[in-house]
Amino acid sequence: MAILHRYRPRLLKVAAGFTLAALLCVASAAVAATFLDAVLADVAGRTIVASDVAVARGLSLFGARPSDAPIRKGDAERLVDGRLIDQEAAQLAIGGNPQEAEEAWQAAAERVGGMAALHAWMDRSLLDEARVRRLVEADLRWRQFVDLRFRAFVFISEAEVTAALGPETHSQEVRERTRERLRAEATDRDLAEWLSEARKRVSVRYAALGEGGIPLPFPMPPLADQTPKDPARRP
């Protein structure tokens, strides 16, 4: 007991050191959590954050592709466009029913190796499942809006296909692939024109990200290497 009493000040210092280290670890975690939600843009009072971009990339949402590259303004712009489309889809009552929403969720999981892999990635990245589901459902509405509002009204004639291919004879398969490419390009043009006007009708502010952008708040899912086959979903 005398020895403990003699070294008590030193032991208290050691204990205080451990306590301080623990507090610093908690503080570091808090900083990381704050960065997870680093604001990239504001759309009429609703924010786009860094983790939105990471989820969109990881699950191939809104035409994004898996990538560990730094987040740049173009990434924020993609999500802003998605937000504008989602708002318009809501006004037009375009939206997936519960079954379609669940199918979209299952499809998102398959793109990263299955539901278990998706949940493991969300756990590692400290992502709330409800929030990730909302992004997946917004992507579903985005695709439905593009289909119903633009792609459904694009018609490519045989003459246009022939003009694109040239005078040589081509198989029906080649002609159909060309038709789909031309249809996707026309859809993209119409969508870009609509988005240009939509951006003028709403207040959008972007955060300064610098020349090099900012790093992703968490890594991509290990198996996030599959891309949607819908031609209108390319960047």
Regions found by a protein language model. Give the residues of each.
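Short, surface-exposed, low-complexity cationic segments
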Residues: 54-68
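Peptidyl-prolyl cis-trans isomerase
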Residues: 2-6, 34-38, 69-235
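A mature extracytoplasmic/lumenal domain signature
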Residues: 47, 52, 208-210
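Short, compositionally biased leader-like segments
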Residues: 1-15
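Short N-terminal segments immediately surrounding and downstream of signal-peptide cleavage
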Residues: 33-50
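Bacterial N-terminal signal peptides
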Residues: 13-27
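Sec/Tat signal peptide C-region and signal peptidase I cleavage site
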Residues: 28-32
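Short, N-terminal intrinsically disordered low-complexity segments that are rich in Pro/Gly
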Residues: 42, 46, 65-69, 74
